[in-house]
Each structure stands twice: as structure tokens, then as C-alpha cells.
Amino acid sequence: MTKREAEELIEIEIDGTEKAECTEESIVEQTYAPAECVSQAIDINEPIGNLKKLLEPRLQCSLDAHEICLQDIQLDPERSLFDQGVKTDGTVQLSVQVISYQGIEPKLNILEIVKPADTVEVVIDPDAHHAESEAHLVEEAQVITLDGTKHITTISDETSEQVTRWAAALEGYRKEQERLGIPYDPIQWSTDQVLHWVVWVMKEFSMTDIDLTTLNISGRELCSLNQEDFFQRVPRGEILWSHLELLRKYVLASQEQQMNEIVTIDQPVQIIPASVQSATPTTIKVINSSAKAAKVQRAPRISGEDRSSPGNRTGNNGQIQLWQFLLELLTDKDARDCISWVGDEGEFKLNQPELVAQKWGQRKNKPTMNYEKLSRALRYYYDGDMICKVQGKRFVYKFVCDLKTLIGYSAAELNRLVTECEQKKLAKMQLHGIAQPVTAVALATASLQTEKDN
């Protein structure tokens, strides 16, 4: 091989990832785009250095020179994730950014850790062309594989890579619903939203044999179909059916949880490397993909269909309304710098009104939203019994409705819950020596604490 040939880069594509391959003296060096990631399952108690051995056969290159990092924080390859602060158990799915290009120190940067469901049921279809197998949604999750054999078996997450794929698919579409304001409950979907879901699943699972016209129906019609009717419409729709069942199971689990705990304050599992002393937050969340794990990454959603309210204020086919959105922010401990309760009588203040408007615009997919438009929308509530403007106080509004009757918690109770959750977060960060960003809420909290101490 000539030097020129050795220096020549050949662009190839493997598993959908663009790579550059250079061969010289039997050494293969591959370069990845910085934004590209690979997923890999690993036991939480296994030395993290084994990640290289797991990835090398897949990437077809040597990773000896690569450091292993957790969100850019270097890890000890001889110790497990558990020993370095990741407090969970079993097998986890890592989202790993492979950095291996000229001028940058090579490393494997773990961006996200996902905890898959503990148990799944695998339904294997005997005929890929005439799908007649019965899909069973079990307590945690469902996985369907097609390999030409006929049997049903229960497996653990340690033995199935597909478990994590389904967990990622469920979490991925949750984020898509969040981004576009699509109702969580499929029964509330419009025809366009049903088609959007079909296209998303087809892309996620590389499907090309689904006729979109067969599912040009509303979410209510979709959810009225039993498995047999669904497969008559979509002969090869096993994956679509399984994904739909997961979404519906998730909604049911969320509703069951809300019956026991009406407002759930976001308390994610924080992964904090024990050896890290950082001036900025360096935490990562373990996402539990179990259908029963209704406590996900957001503050609670308060849906009009989940809670009966006078006059059915939600409207818009289940889409979130402005009053719901504000209440959602008010129950999010991480949003207190832009909006917070004032006292215990239902008053709240937009500390950063333009930021609140921006968040509302993102939720409704309206990039031009600003506070002027938001305030006009709030005026529609003035004549009713939901929200009013507090006279003489700038950017201060008040819930005049009975929140206790509406959602089960009063404004005072909500304020107390969010405050307690924020204090727990601050205490945890202080325990691990991680500095808290200075915000108006943080300063106010510190000031109140000082007054109490004195």
C-alpha cells in the first residue's frame, strides 16, 4: 500500500453512522461525527473499562487510546459505574458519544444512562408475511421479534438488547409528543397526529412496508380497534401495535399513579461521580423505562380529562391549555426562577415573563410568542373563575378557582411541596460538593434561611 493510498479516506456508512476509514499497516482508524452516538448495554457492576471491549467488535476499530468519561468527567476504567456513583442495579443502556477525530483527545463520552424494564414478554411471529400472532402487553414492557420460530418466552433485560430498544422507542416518542404538544393519550389524537405517529415508528424501526392510507383515522378510532381488526388494516403492523400498546399502558399507569398521588414533583435519580468536585452541576439522570415508572423527567401534567373541572376548560381535543401550563411550571422545582408562588392564597408571579412566554411558545410550537401575546391570552380568563390579574402588582396573577377541588391540592400545599423538593435538591448538591447556580430563587431561599437561623 502506498502512502497516498494509506492517507486516502473512504466514506462508508455502517448502521446508519457516517464513518471515515483509513488503513495503514493493518491499523484501522475511524472518525465519527461528534454528534453521533452508539448505544451499548452493560452491567452496572462491571468495570467500565469493559465498555471498550464491547464496542470494538461493533465499531471494528481499536479503542485502547480512548478515555471513558461521564458527561466529560473522566471515569476510572477499573471500577464499575456503581462504584463511581451510579446508584442503580442490573443492566443499563448507555448512550455513548464516540470522539475519535484529528486534533481532539479520543474518548468515549457517556451522555445518558437508561434503566430498561426488568421483565418483558417476547412474542415471536411464525410468519412475517401473515401476522397472526397475539401480542401480550405484560406488566413492564413488550418486545416483539420475528425470527421464524413459534414460541412465547419471558426474558430479563440482561439477555435482550431489544428491551432497551423498546424502552428508547417509548421514551423517544414521549419527547416527540412533548415537543409538538401531541396528547399523551392516543385516544385524543387527531388524524394528522395518528399519521405522524405511524411515520415516526416507521422511521424509528426502519419499516417501509406500511400503507399510511390504512391508518388515516382519528385516535379514538385507532384505539377502538382490537388486535385482529388492527392487523386486518395493517397486515405487517406488529411493531406499530406493540408501540401503541406501550403508549396506552403508559397512560394507564400514569392515571393509576395520579389516583394515589395527584401531584408528582420531579425527583429524578441523580448520578453524581463521587470523585467529582465541580463548580457547575454535572449530573445525569437514570431514566427508568418501566411502564409503571410514571415519574419521568418533567413536572406533573394536569390534564383536563384526568381531572374533571367546571366547563371542561381544557378543550382543543385534550391539548394543554395556558392555565394548565402555568400550573405545570408552578409545580416544577427547576422553573421557580421564571415563575413562582407568592404566598399561600393562589397568587403567583412571572419572575421572567418573557421566558415564560418563550416556554409557552415552545410547547405550542409558536416561535413568535412573547409576553404581550401571553398576557392577552390570560385576559380571556378574567371573566371566568380560573385566573385573574392582581391589581397593583406587576406580573402577579392569581388562581381564583378552587385548586383543592380541581386537582386535589391547594396552592399552599403545592408551594410547600415544590419548596421541599427544591430544598432536597440543594441539600443533595451540597452533600456532593456541587455548586448551585446563583438564581433569584436561590438567593431568596438563602435569605429566608438566614432569617430563620437568626
Swiss-Prot record:
| Pfam families recorded | Ets, GABP-alpha, SAM_PNT
Domain named PNT is located at 168-251
GO function terms (MF aspect): chromatin binding; DNA-binding transcription activator activity, RNA polymerase II-specific; DNA-binding transcription factor activity; DNA-binding transcription factor activity, RNA polymerase II-specific; RNA polymerase II cis-regulatory region sequence-specific DNA binding; sequence-specific double-stranded DNA binding; transcription cis-regulatory region binding
- Which keywords appear in this protein's UniProt record, sorted alphabetically? DNA-binding, Nucleus, Phosphoprotein, Transcription, Transcription regulation
Q: Which domain of life is it from?
A: Eukaryota
Q: Which residues bind DNA?
A: 320-400
Sites bearing Phosphoserine, chain numbering: S303
> Which PROSITE patterns does the entry mention?
ETS_DOMAIN_1 (PS00345), ETS_DOMAIN_2 (PS00346), ETS_DOMAIN_3 (PS50061), PNT (PS51433)
Subcellular localization is given as: Nucleus
Cross-referenced InterPro entries? Ets_dom, ETS_fam, GABP_asu_N, Pointed_dom, SAM/pointed_sf, TF_GA-bd_asu, Ubiquitin-like_domsf, WH-like_DNA-bd_sf
**Gene3D superfamilies from the entry?**
Phosphatidylinositol 3-kinase Catalytic Subunit, Chain A, domain 1, Transcription Factor, Ets-1, Winged helix-like DNA-binding domain superfamily/Winged helix DNA-binding domain
Q: Name one GO cellular component term.
A: nucleus
- Gene Ontology terms: biological process: blastocyst formation; cell differentiation; negative regulation of megakaryocyte differentiation; negative regulation of transcription by RNA polymerase II; positive regulation of transcription by RNA polymerase II; regulation of transcription by RNA polymerase II
Query: Where are the stretches annotated Disordered?
Result: 297-316
Major localization listed first in the record, in broad terms: nucleus
Quaternary structure and interacting proteins, as annotated: Heterotetramer of two alpha and two beta subunits.
Q: What does this protein do?
A: Transcription factor capable of interacting with purine rich repeats (GA repeats). Positively regulates transcription of transcriptional repressor RHIT/ZNF205. (Microbial infection) Necessary for the expression of the Adenovirus E4 gene.
Q: Of which family is this protein a member?
A: Belongs to the ETS family.
Q: Tell me what this protein is called.
A: GA-binding protein alpha chain
User: From which organism does this entry originate?
Assistant: Homo sapiens
| Gene from which this protein is expressed | GABPA
